C-alpha cells in the first residue's frame, strides 16, 4: 500500500496564509497539515508516499527534507502548470505510480482524526471512497449511495440541490484504490476524460463516469464513529479546524471565545446557550421561510415602526418602548446612561456590571449555597447604601432564583420612595411557573413606577436568538427617547421585524410551548438529581445551576463532556461570586437532548 498526496494547488482563498506556501504548509494549532498527515501515514507501514507538488513546491520539498527518512519513503512529482490546471492533471502526472500499488489517495488540505485511515484500511473492500453524511458546512463533490453502500452517482457543485441534501454524502477526499482498479478502470478513464475535456477538471469527475458502469467496483464507506475531519479552504475553515482539533487544555477557550455561532459545529449539543426548545412552531417557521425572498431584498423599517410593532407584541404603549438588536445593545445604552452607585446581585449576567466602573458597583451575594434571596433581603442590605440604581434579574442568571411579582412591585415602591432607578431584567420570566401573571410589562405598572425600566430579551423564551431582538420599556419617556436616539435607526433587520409583526398569530402556541417547557424542566431536574456528584439548585429559568460535590472540578467536567460526548455546558468558575466553588450551569433543552446529557453524566 502506498499513499499519493495531491498538494499542487495555490489555495487562493486563504489569501495571505498561502502567499509563500502551498495549503498543506498551513499550521493548525501550531502543527502544519503536511506534518500531521505524514505523521499519521508513518504509522501505517506504507511502501512509499508520493506527493504531487506545484505551487511553492520547492518550499514544501525543502521543509520536509529528510525528517521522515527513518519512517517513510517520500517521492515527488511536479506539476509545473499548477496555475492553469486542476487536480485531475496533478493525478494524471502520477498515474504511472498510481498503477504500481494499492493506493490511498489524499488531498492535502484536510485535517482528520487518526482513526479514519484505520477505518478505510481495515475495511476488506478494495476500492472505497470515505464519505460523511452531509452537513451545512460541507462544500464540493457529493455522492448518493444505496443500502449496500454502492455509489449511485457523484454530484458536482453545479448539480447540487438543497432540496436533496437529506440524501447526500460528502466525499472526505480520502480514497482507497486497488492496483487493479487503477490499472483497469481509473487510469484508462482518466486518460480519456482528460483528452476529451481538458486538464482543468477534478479527478472526482472520472469517478462519476465510472459509477455509470454496471460494475463500477467502487463503494462508499460512511463515517459512523463520529470521527472528526475538516477541509480547509479559507480563513474561516482554519478557525473552525483549530477549534475542532484544539488541545484539550485549550478546547473550552476556543469555544468560549466564539460567543455563539455553534451551527458551524453540527455535532455539538449545546447546553450552554439558553433557548426555548419548543418555540417557534414549525408553522411559524414556514411563514418566515415563505417570506424569505422579500425580507432578504427589502430594507427594514426604522425605529418608529419597530417600536410600534414591539409595543403591539407586548401590549404596551409605543412611547414606552424601544427595540434593540438583542437586549445586549440596550443594556450597553442603558448602563452608559445611569450614574452613581448601582446595586447588583452576584453572581449575575456580566453584561451589566461590565459596563460600569467597579467602584460604582455595590454587590450583594446571597449567604447560602443555593444563592436564594428575597425582596426583603435586598431591602435590608441596600437600605443604607445610598444607591442611584438597583438591578434585579428575575429569574436570576445563573442561579434561577425568582422573586414573585408582588414582591418585585414592593421593591419598585421601595425604590420609588428613595429616588432609586429600578432596572428589572425579565428575559427569563416566561419560564417561571404562572408565567402569564409574572411580567411587569403592563401599562398600569409602568405608569405607576416611572422609576422602573424593564429589560426583556426576545431570544430566550421565544427561541429566536439568531434574530437579535430585545426591548426596553419604561414610562420615563425621556429615557426611552434618549435610548432611541442612542441606537441606530436601523438597528434590527427585516427578518426580526417580520417576526414581531406576525407573532400575535402564534401567541397561544407560545403559551403552550412555555407550559410544555415547565413540565420538561421538572422532569429533567428529577433525572439530574440522580447524578451522585451533582447538587442541583431548583430554578424558575431555563437552566439549572449545579454544584459538583465530588470526582471532578467544574473545569474537568465541562472538558470531559465536550471531549468525550460533544456536549457543551457552562463552567461558572470564572463568574464573580462563584470562584473556585465548582458550579456549572446546564440549560434545559427538549426531552431527547436532556436524556442524552443525563446518560453521558451517568458514565462519568
Go through each PLM region and give its residues:
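Conserved PLP-binding catalytic core of the aspartate aminotransferase-like
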Residues: 518, 531-565
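PLP-dependent aminotransferase class I/II
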Residues: 169-171, 280-281, 302, 451-537
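Conserved N-terminal catalytic core of the sugar/cofactor nucleotidyltransferase
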Residues: 1-5, 31-103
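PLP-dependent aminotransferase-like
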Residues: 336-392
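N-terminal nucleotide-binding beta1-loop-alpha1 segment
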Residues: 1-18
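N-terminal "arm"/small-domain region of PLP-dependent enzymes with the aminotransferase-like
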Residues: 240-298, 385
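Active-site pre-lysine segment of PLP-dependent enzymes
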Residues: 119-123, 372-385, 398-461
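Conserved core of the sugar-phosphate nucleotidyltransferase
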Residues: 113-197
Amino acid at each position: 500500500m502506498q499513499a499519493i498526496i495531491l498538494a499542487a494547488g495555490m489555495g487562493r482563498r486563504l489569501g495571505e496564509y498561502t502567499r509563500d506556501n502551498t495549503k498543506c504548509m498551513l499550521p493548525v494549532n501550531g502543527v502544519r497539515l503536511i506534518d500531521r498527515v505524514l505523521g499519521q501515514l508513518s504509522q501505517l507501514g506504507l511502501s512509499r508516499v508520493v506527493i504531487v507538488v506545484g505551487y511553492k513546491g520547492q518550499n514544501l520539498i525543502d521543509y520536509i527534507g529528510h525528517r521522515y527518512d527513518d519512517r517513510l519513503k517520500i517521492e515527488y512529482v511536479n506539476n509545473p502548470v499548477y496555475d492553469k490546471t486542476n487536480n485531475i492533471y496533478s493525478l494524471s502526472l502520477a498515474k504511472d505510480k498510481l498503477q504500481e500499488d494499492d493506493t490511498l489517495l489524499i488531498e492535502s488540505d484536510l485535517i482528520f482524526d487518526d482513526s479514519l485511515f484505520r477505518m478505510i484500511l481495515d475495511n476488506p473492500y478494495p476500492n472505497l471512497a470515505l464519505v460523511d453524511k452531509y452537513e451545512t458546512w460541507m462544500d464540493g463533490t457529493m455522492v448518493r449511495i444505496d443500502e449496500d453502500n454502492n455509489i449511485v452517482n457523484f454530484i458536482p457543485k453545479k448539480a447540487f440541490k438543497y432540496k436533496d441534501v437529506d440524501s447526500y454524502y460528502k466525499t472526505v477526499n480520502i480514497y482507497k484504490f486497488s492496483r487493479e482498479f487503477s490499472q483497469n478502470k481509473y487510469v484508462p478513464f482518466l486518460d480519456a476524460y482528460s483528452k476529451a475535456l481538458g486538464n482543468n477538471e477534478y479527478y472526482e469527475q472520472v469517478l462519476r463516469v465510472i459509477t455509470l458502469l454496471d460494475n463500477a467496483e467502487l463503494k462508499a464507506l460512511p463515517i459512523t464513529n463520529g470521527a472528526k475531519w475538516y477541509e480547509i479552504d479559507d480563513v474561516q475553515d482554519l478557525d473552525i479546524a483549530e477549534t475542532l482539533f484544539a488541545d484539550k487544555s485549550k478546547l473550552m477557550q476556543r469555544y468560549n471565545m466564539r460567543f455563539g455561532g455553534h451551527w458551524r459545529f453540527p455535532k455539538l449539543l449545546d447546553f450552554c446557550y439558553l433557548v426555548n426548545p419548543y418555540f417557534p412552531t414549525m408553522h411559524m417557521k414556514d411563514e418566515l421561510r415563505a417570506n424569505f425572498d422579500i425580507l432578504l431584498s427589502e430594507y427594514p423599517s426604522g425605529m418608529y415602526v419597530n417600536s410600534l410593532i414591539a409595543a403591539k407584541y407586548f401590549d404596551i404603549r409605543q412611547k414606552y418602548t424601544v427595540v434593540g438588536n438583542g437586549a445586549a445593545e440596550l443594556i450597553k445604552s442603558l448602563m452608559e446612561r445611569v450614574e452613581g452607585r448601582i446595586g447588583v446581585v452576584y453572581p449575575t449576567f456580566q453584561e451589566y456590571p461590565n459596563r460600569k466602573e467597579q467602584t460604582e458597583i455595590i454587590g450583594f451575594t446571597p449567604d447560602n449555597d443555593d444563592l436564594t434571596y428575597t425582596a426583603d433581603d435586598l431591602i435590608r442590605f441596600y437600605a443604607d447604601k445610598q444607591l442611584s440604581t438597583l438591578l434585579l434579574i428575575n429569574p436570576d442568571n445563573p442561579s434561577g432564583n425568582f422573586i414573585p411579582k408582588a414582591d418585585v412591585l414592593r421593591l419598585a415602591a421601595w425604590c420609588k420612595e428613595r429616588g432609586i432607578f429600578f432596572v428589572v431584567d425579565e428575559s427569563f420570566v416566561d419560564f417561571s411557573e404562572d408565567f402569564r401573571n409574572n411580567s411587569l410589562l403592563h401599562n398600569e405598572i409602568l405608569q405607576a413606577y416611572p422609576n422602573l425600566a424593564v429589560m426583556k430579551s426576545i431570544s430566550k423564551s421565544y427561541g429566536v436568538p439568531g434574530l437579535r431582538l430585545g426591548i426596553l420599556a419604561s414610562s420615563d419617556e425621556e429615557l426611552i427617547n434618549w435610548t432611541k436616539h442612542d441606537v441606530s435607526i436601523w438597528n434590527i433587520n427585516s427578518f426580526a421585524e417580520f417576526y414581531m409583526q406576525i407573532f400575535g398569530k402564534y401567541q397561544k402556541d407560545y403559551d403552550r410551548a412555555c407550559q410544555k417547557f415547565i413540565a420538561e424542566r421538572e422532569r429533567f431536574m428529577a433525572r439530574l438529581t440522580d447524578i451522585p456528584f451533582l447538587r442541583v439548585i431548583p430554578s424558575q429559568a431555563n437552566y439549572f445551576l449545579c454544584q459538583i460535590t465530588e470526582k471532578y472540578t467544574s473545569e474537568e467536567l465541562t472538558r470531559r463532556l465536550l471531549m468525550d460526548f460533544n456536549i457543551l455546558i457552562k463552567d461558572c468558575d470564572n463568574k464573580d461570586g462563584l470562584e473556585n466553588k465548582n458550579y456549572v450551569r446546564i440549560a434545559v433543552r427538549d426531552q431527547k437532548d436532556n436524556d442524552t446529557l443525563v446518560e453521558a453524566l451517568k458514565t462519568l
